Amino acid sequence: MRLQTLLDTVDNLATDIEIRGLSLDSRQVKPGYVFIALKGERHHGLDFAEQAIAKGAVAVIYEPDGAGVIPEVAIQWVAVSGLADKLGAIAARFYGDPSQHLQVIGITGTNGKTTCSQLLAQALDDSAVIGTLGWGEPDNLTPTLNTTPDALAVQQMLGSCRDMGKRLVAME
C-alpha cells in the first residue's frame, strides 16, 4: 500500500512511498514499515522513533501534541492530530477494512465474556475468536500481548481471520 492511500486526508506528503506494515512498537518494526508514534502517559512514541528507523521504518506517523523535537532523519514524517482516535480507521484501511467482510459479534459485560465468545465461535462454522485467551480458531489460538488488544492489533487480527476464510468473529 502507498502511504498517500493510507492517509488519504493528508495532502502535504513530501514523497509517496510503498509501505509493508504498521507498528506501534519500535521493537517490532521491520523494513518498509510505518512506525506510529502515539502520545503516552509517560513517554511519547517519538522517543522510540530512532530505534524504529534503525530497524527499517520508512515513515513515522506521529501525534503532534507533546511531540517535542523531531529527530533529524531523512524519512517521511507525518503529523496527525488526534492520532489515537484515528488509529482504528488507519489500521482498517491498511488491512483492507476486514470487518466489512466479516460478521463481528462483540461480547461485553463483567463476567462470562470468554465463555460466551468461545462457545459461540465453537458452535458456528467458519468462526474465529478474539479475546482474553488469544485469537484465531477456538482450538488453535494465538496468544495476544495484551488482554485488550489495541486498535492496530484488532484490525490485523480481523484481517488474518478474513484471510483464513472465516465469516464470523466473536470478540470480547
Where are the model-predicted features located?
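N-terminal leader/targeting and accessory segments in enzymes
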Residues: 1-89
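Short, mixed-charge, low-aromatic patches
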Residues: 6-7, 44-49, 77, 110-119, ...
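Short beta-strand segments at enzyme active-site cores
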Residues: 60-63, 168-172
